Amino acid sequence: MNRVLSKGPKGLNGLLRACPSNSGRSFLYHSTYNVSSRTFWSASRLRSEDSPSGSQPLKPDPNDGIGNNTSSASSQHTPWYLQEEALIEEPRQISSRDQIPELPENSPAILPVLLDYIFKDLGLDELRLIDLRGLETPPPIGANSIMIIGTARSVKHLNVSADRLCRWLRSTYKLTPYADGLLGRNELKIKLRRKARRARVASRAGTTVDEKDDGITTGWICVNAGVVENSPVGEQASRKVEGFGNIVGGTRVVVQMFTEEKRAEVDLEGLWLATIERDRRQKQVSIDTKSDAPHEEVRAPTPVQNSSSDHVFGPHCRSSTILPLEQRRGLHSKCRLLGPETEHNQEDGLDDGLDDGLDMSPDSISTPTDQLAANRTCDKEVDTDSLLEHLSGLPDGQVLSELGAGQEDRDSTPFLRRFYDALSQMSTEEAAVALVKLLCTAISRHHQGYSKESLWKAFMTCNYHTYPISDELGFEIVSALLTALPPHQKGPKATGVLPEADRELALRVLEHLSLRGTDVLNMKVFHLLYEAASHPTSFSGEEVIKDVTDATKDRPTSRVAKMIESLDIQFDPEDARKLMMSMFRNGDYDGFWNLWHKLPLYGSPRTSADYEMLFRLHADLRDECRARDCVSTWVPMMSREHPPIPLRGQVVQDIMHCLLIGEPAIDRMARAGSTSNLVLIWNDCKNIALGRGRRGSVERMNVV
């Protein structure tokens, strides 16, 4: 076998050639010494033995694509994660969620910073800026406002964004924003916990909790930043003013935050855009109407004063054009003033007395310039003010008779004739303000011919035309509207009843005053509100409450007192003393003593008039226990005041009256030789009243 199968490749090759193939195909073989990297061929061809394997390079079959694919794949194949995509040259579309709205003209300096903070730091989407300056905006927003509307991503994002915005405005710009609908950080967590607890309890009981308005998912928070810029907005060509109150110089910024569902439901921007479009159309119509109308001759608002060198002497010819609401004034040598003593005369005597009020005869005036200057001192506004001042000093009965039958009566009394005569010669602005003052006086004196509705209409007329109303006059209007019905009235409208409609009118006046910039959070306003709360709203609520200690907490006045304590109101000594008297008469003794102790702490030392009021109130109360405590405690304190209060005058009579209430038999006890503190005070007061001037007992009590 070894001889047949010779060793080496040649022997094996010969054996394979000698063996016939059963399938008609030859076996392919590879040399064990000459290994090729080529794979097996699929074609049925024999390899020539004569051709050496390594002499010439192998040429692949043209029909075989494996060689080409292998060589090209090694050079062109790249994994997918290393392949670079071709850059898209089309510009990226920026949605409205990623845009900051454009700034309007004459915008405040804080507006771009505020928009950037809301967009980048707070993360509100779909910002929309609406310029409401010049429009009639509702009172909660205020006049001259710029509104920003944004969308939060959730209820929690809404509350957190509003809270951060308020804190940022306070710390960065020292503003005082307020957010309607905002829940505090802890408050939101507590409410969410309670809601989850109720849901768990309901699920255990097999029921569902249906809370449509749980106070959490309102989805709307309004952050009013207030006035962010005090400089006035550029005046437009038109002088027309919309809304109520004076022209507000500053610009307000209001940020409206919504959730996506609530914003789509409310559609606030749609409402305001429709309002702006309607206002634009109205202005366009008015401009077209004015352009088509013929030009009219008008008088300049301020007369031009020529110098003395330009003055032309001689007759001055006036235009024959009749101007509407034209003032006609004449030069008089006498100023008509109404003295208090002339009102008691007869009707004829009153006319003479008014003409003889102040003599400015031509003898005392040398030149026409002096006559003109003297005439300017007798302005008609001062004339009406003097008439009203004289009227306010008269008793109630005489005031009612002087005011005539009612508002339509203008000539039944000398006062009405003089007043409306002066009113006809005044400008429309001055006449409207003077009429408001007359209505306030008439309503405060309980004249049935002058209604509170007419006062409200007169006030709104002044607001609509932006007539100047002082803060003092505004508070007089509120006081007149809060005046209770007269004591002598019978029937359903009983004594001291203040209807709810009158209270609502007074609160609306305070709201308009607040929009004009008037400080309504003061002692005077809260005293008026306290007085109004002490009156019942109907006949059924007029019953007197005897048990003060049990019913004080349920009274409406207690809520006003709590507001006074909680708010940081500037202390006004005069109004505080009035509020003290109202509290004592209403049974709020704790509030009375609280203000009584605050007087010296706020730099207003107690005076003799204060002690007279103290002892008189306790005497009128006719409570024996309170009267005794008041006398025994505060009579010795009079000498410790700074400066000390002397025991003399009217305060002595008030102390003795209070002692008689607290101890009816005190005079008999004094004659019996009692040495109690009240008897010692009684003896001192009695000696001072008799002119003996002894105060030894009170001084000994102070030492003790």
Swiss-Prot record:
The keyword Ribonucleoprotein does not apply. It is found in: Mitochondrion inner membrane. InterPro entries: Atp25, NT_sf. Its main location: mitochondrion. GO terms for cellular component: mitochondrial inner membrane. GO terms for biological process: mitochondrial gene expression; mRNA stabilization. Keywords: Membrane, Mitochondrion, Mitochondrion inner membrane, Transit peptide. The keyword Nucleus does not apply. It comes from the Eukaryota. Residues 289-299 have a biased composition (Basic and acidic residues). Residues 66-76 have a biased composition (Polar residues). Residues 1-47 form a transit peptide. Belongs to the ATP25 family. Probable mitochondrial mRNA stabilization factor. PANTHER family: ATPASE SYNTHESIS PROTEIN 25, MITOCHONDRIAL. This is ATPase synthesis protein 25, mitochondrial. It comes from Aspergillus fumigatus (strain CBS 144.89 / FGSC A1163 / CEA10).
